[in-house]
From Swiss-Prot:
One of its GO terms (cellular component) is plasma membrane. Binds 1 zinc ion per subunit. The keyword Phosphoprotein does not apply. Its EC number is 3.4.24.-. This is Protease HtpX homolog. Belongs to the peptidase M48B family. It comes from the Bacteria. Keywords: Cell inner membrane, Cell membrane, Hydrolase, Membrane, Metal-binding, Metalloprotease, Protease, Transmembrane, Transmembrane helix, Zinc. It comes from Bacteroides fragilis (strain ATCC 25285 / DSM 2151 / CCUG 4856 / JCM 11019 / LMG 10263 / NCTC 9343 / Onslow / VPI 2553 / EN-2). GO terms for biological process: proteolysis. Zn(2+) binds at H165, H169, E245.
Length: 322
């Protein structure tokens, strides 16, 4: 397996990040237009034919454009400034001080110096299972997080391979790409959940006010449209997540000149990757191996279309042939 040059990979991921940033508001706009069309089709009696329906749809959509732009900007601003704290809370991570574990700091510093990289922050998850992940969107927020179990159960060469894997995610800028994709998917998930909860609440009060029937229809349409966006955005996110693991494995092998050490580490990680605190699927894909029960059956159904990680056996086999 040949590793793509660092400059090439950075350029590709920067381009993909830009495409996602453009695609996100475009998809929101398309789905908003679909919602407007369905809403008018089901709620307005059209005596003038299809032309009038489209004209009303266009007018409603134009009126909503400022809200679309404002919503997208607010969502990304919030995500930009809060992604690190949200991920830390979702994984149960905390800062690891140098005095707690000089060994980890020495390994990270040596690898960073060999690559001319700025030292990232280091966090630890107090869990005896074996896992790790990288996060952040710039040099001020880049972080390598290791579980207590992976620190205690891997030797220095294996741990160096894992750290190199996470540093490759940072160096290639695919951490930023993945977080953008997580934000991209998150808004559709949020909208679908809001609509679903609203429909449930409205159904309880429907008998008190027959006018609620129209409101429920609007919410159902919103939920359907949001679910469509969530489905396609999730497929895109999974595809990005799977490919980045292969690239990070290859980058770590190149960085350490010891692919067998990372292969050995992955074999140990696969035996116990479950991190108890991790419940969110979008956060789970950040890890070197899926930290939940799905890690053992990630490729079941649809040939792995919905898998966040490639088969770890395949990753090990590639490293052993590197």
């Amino acid at each position: 397996m040949q590793y793509v040059g660092i400059q090439t990979q950075q350029s590709r991921n920067n381009l993909r990040s830009g495409i996602l940033l453009i695609l996100f508001p475009c998809l929101v706009a398309v789905l908003t237009y679909l919602f407007c069309y369905l809403l008018i089709t089901f709620t307005v009696e059209d005596d003038y034919g299809q032309y009038n329906t489209l004209a009303m749809t266009n007018q409603m959509f134009i009126n909503l454009i400022p809200y679309i732009i404002g919503g997208v900007l607010v969502w990304f601003i919030i995500a930009y400034f809060t992604n690190s704290s949200i991920i830390k809370a979702a994984t149960g991570a905390r800062p690891l001080e140098r005095k707690e574990n000089k060994r980890i700091y020495n390994l990270v510093e040596n690898l960073c110096m060999s690559q001319g990289m700025k030292m990232p922050k280091i966090n630890i998850i107090d869990d005896d299972s074996l896992n790790a992940y990288a996060s952040g969107i710039n040099e001020q927020t880049y972080t390598v997080t290791l579980s207590k179990g992976i620190i205690e159960k891997l030797n220095d060469e294996e741990l160096e391979g894992v750290i190199a894997h996470e540093l490759t995610h940072i160096r290639n800028h695919d951490v930023r790409l993945l977080i953008i994709s997580i934000v991209f998917v998150g808004i559709f998930s949020m909208l679908a959940q809001i609509a679903l909860r609203s429909v449930y609440y409205s159904s309880w009060t429907r008998s008190r006010n027959d006018k609620n029937n129209g409101a429920i229809l609007i919410l159902v349409l919103a939920m359907i449209v949001a679910a469509i966006g969530y489905f396609f955005a999730t497929l895109m996110r999974f595809a990005i997540s799977r490919k980045r693991e292969y690239m990070a494995d290859a980058g770590a092998a190149e960085m350490t000149k010891n692919p067998l050490a990372l292969a050995s580490a992955l074999r140990k990680i696969s035996a116990d990757p479950d991190i108890e605190a991790v419940e969110r699927e979008d956060v789970a894909q950040l890890f070197i191996q899926h930290p939940g029960k799905q890690a053992k059956s990630a490729l079941s159904g649809l040939s792995g279309l919905f898998a966040t990680h490639p088969p770890i056996e395949k990753r090990i086999a590639i490293l052993e042939q590197f």
